[in-house]
């Protein structure tokens, strides 16, 4: 049994398989998942796991070079917007309209569905490299 890091075997495999510029999505409970994109559903009940907890764990495990979020998060979910800016203070954060954001999710390797019940609590993490 694994002692450290991500224990979810599906999520651990996706992260291990990522290459430079590959994308994964951290999604709230309501974000639609495009047909053909793998959904890793972590949701247990409203609020669990939270968007912030999930993003923090992924930030520890993944080389992230860029973050993409819906611009609407800044006005409608300031707590999570500030959280993203603090967590990814050394990475570029690009803001798009929510509709543009949803279109980009079709190119993701996976959508990780959380139990988050706040608006626009979604982001796309673009993989970087360690060298």
Swiss-Prot record:
Q: Which reaction does it catalyse?
A: beta-D-ribopyranose = beta-D-ribofuranose
Q: Where is the active site?
A: 20
InterPro entries per UniProt = D-ribose_pyranase, RbsD-like_sf, RbsD_FucU
Q: Which GO terms describe its molecular function?
A: D-ribose pyranase activity; intramolecular lyase activity; intramolecular transferase activity; monosaccharide binding
Q: Which UniProt keywords apply?
A: Carbohydrate metabolism, Cytoplasm, Isomerase
Record-level GO BP terms:
D-ribose catabolic process
Which pathway is this protein engaged in? Carbohydrate metabolism; D-ribose degradation; D-ribose 5-phosphate from beta-D-ribopyranose: step 1/2
Q: Principal place where this protein is found? A: cytoplasm
Where does the UniProt annotation locate this protein? Answer: Cytoplasm
Q: What is its EC number?
A: 5.4.99.62
List GO terms (cellular component aspect).
Answer: cytosol
Q: Which Pfam families match?
A: RbsD_FucU
Residues that, per the record, bind substrate = 28, 98, 120-122
Q: Which leading EC class covers this enzyme?
A: isomerase
Q: What role does it play?
A: Catalyzes the interconversion of beta-pyran and beta-furan forms of D-ribose.
UniProt lists the family membership as follows: Belongs to the RbsD / FucU family. RbsD subfamily.
Oligomeric form and interacting partners: Homodecamer; dimer of pentamers.
UniProt name for this protein:
D-ribose pyranase
Tell me the organism. Answer: Bacillus subtilis (strain 168)
